[in-house]
């Protein structure tokens, strides 16, 4: 096969990896896929308790919202917030 034909074939196939089956661009970050699926299902905000895997840590609150993606805060009573230029984090009382 001539080199030009191989180059054209590669250029044709290469962009296909950037799109999923629905024709939408695939997110590049590791948390984007789950968040994108949740948003496509109706954008339900879901908060449930979870255990943080650090020593002497109390219960935390898992947060899956449009704003926070999927994360856990260090203790009860915390809420997920977005800090401008710092990304997602927790806002805890006290």
UniProtKB/Swiss-Prot annotation:
Endpoints of the signal sequence: 1-25
Removed propeptide positions: 26-44
Compartment(s) of residence: Secreted
Entry keywords, A to Z: Acetylcholine receptor inhibiting toxin, Disulfide bond, Gamma-carboxyglutamic acid, Ion channel impairing toxin, Neurotoxin, Postsynaptic neurotoxin, Secreted, Signal, Toxin
Molecular-function annotations in GO: acetylcholine receptor inhibitor activity; ion channel regulator activity; toxin activity
Gene Ontology CC annotation, any one: host cell postsynaptic membrane
Keyword Secreted on entry: yes
Disulfide topology: 63-72, 68-80, 73-90, 78-92
Tissue: Expressed by the venom duct.
Similarity comment text for this entry: Belongs to the conotoxin D superfamily.
Purpose of the protein: Alpha-conotoxins act on postsynaptic membranes, they bind to the nicotinic acetylcholine receptors (nAChR) and thus inhibit them. Through its two C-terminal domains, this homodimeric protein would bind to two nAChR allosteric sites, located outside the nAChR C-loop of the principal binding face and at the adjacent binding interface in a clockwise direction. This toxin specifically blocks mammalian neuronal nAChR of the alpha-7/CHRNA7, alpha-3-beta-2/CHRNA3-CHRNB2 and alpha-4-beta-2/CHRNA4-CHRNB2 subtypes.
Subunit structure of this chain's protein: Hetero-, homo- or pseudo-homodimer (identical sequence, different post-translational modifications).
Protein name: Alpha-conotoxin-like Vt20.1
Naturally occurring in which organism (per UniProt): Conus planorbis (Planorbis cone)
């Amino acid at each position: 096969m001539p080199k030009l034909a191989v180059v054209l074939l590669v250029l044709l196939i290469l962009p296909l990896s950037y799109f999923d089956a629905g024709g939408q661009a695939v997110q590049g970050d590791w948390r984007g896929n789950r968040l994108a699926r949740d948003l496509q299902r109706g954008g339900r905000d879901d908060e449930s308790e979870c255990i943080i895997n650090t020593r002497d840590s109390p219960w935390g609150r898992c947060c899956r919202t449009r704003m926070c993606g999927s994360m856990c805060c260090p203790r009860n009573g915390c809420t997920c917030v977005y800090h401008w230029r710092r990304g997602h984090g927790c806002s805890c009382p006290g």
